[in-house]
């Protein structure tokens, strides 16, 4: 049974109904409609914690989707799943692909920074100070990019940049 017929959540049902109306009203081509259906089902499965099903849907959407901006969001969501599963290197690959297609995606930039920061903390705990500092510097660069795009977001990152002396831009604060 397609995921669109299994939504138990009111918000998911509402989103699905609205998406179906948009698909019927707006003149998309068949391929774009199919890609959107897979993307929508992927988001629904991801929200339900059904990561394998979500990935299957996202990969199908990627095969069909031609629009670079839409592809960036699909790649971003795939990155989220891999990150949630502790597959940080794989998540980084997808986030980097997403920002190659859409450099104005602050959430992907933030997630890259979060992974580098996490890896920096791990390196620090294991006594690899030079590696730790290099990873923290990478995290800082990605957080700065994310904050430039969304200055009212990422307050904790802004504070971390300030406290660690990695912020050259007072405009954040």
Curated annotation (Swiss-Prot):
Compartments in which it is found: Cellular thylakoid membrane
Entry keywords, A to Z: Membrane, Photosynthesis, Repeat, Thylakoid, TPR repeat
UniProt-listed SMART domains: TPR
Record's GO cellular component terms: plasma membrane-derived thylakoid membrane
Pfam families per UniProt: TPR_1
Membrane-topology annotation of the record: Peripheral membrane protein
Protein name: Photosystem I assembly protein Ycf3
Organism: Gloeothece citriformis (strain PCC 7424)
Classification lineage: Bacteria, Bacillati, Cyanobacteriota, Cyanophyceae, Oscillatoriophycideae
């Amino acid at each position: 049974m397609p995921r669109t017929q299994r939504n138990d959540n009111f918000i998911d049902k509402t989103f699905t109904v609205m998406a179906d109306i948009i698909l019927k009203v707006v003149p998309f081509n068949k391929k774009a409609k199919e890609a959107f259906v897979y993307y929508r089902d992927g988001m629904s499965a991801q929200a339900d914690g059904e990561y394998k099903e979500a990935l299957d849907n996202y990969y199908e959407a990627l095969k069909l989707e031609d629009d670079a901006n839409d592809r960036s969001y699909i790649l971003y969501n795939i990155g989220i799943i891999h990150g949630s599963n502790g597959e940080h290197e794989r998540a980084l690959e997808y986030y980097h692909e997403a920002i190659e297609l859409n450099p104005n995606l602050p959430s992907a930039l933030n997630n890259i920074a979060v992974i580098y920061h996490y890896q920096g903390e791990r390196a620090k705990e294991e006594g690899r100070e030079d590696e730790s500092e290099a990873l923290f510097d990478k995290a800082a660069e990605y957080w700065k990019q994310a904050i430039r795009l969304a200055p009212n977001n990422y307050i904790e990152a802004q504070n971390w940049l300030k406290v660690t002396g990695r912020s050259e831009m007072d405009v954040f604060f």
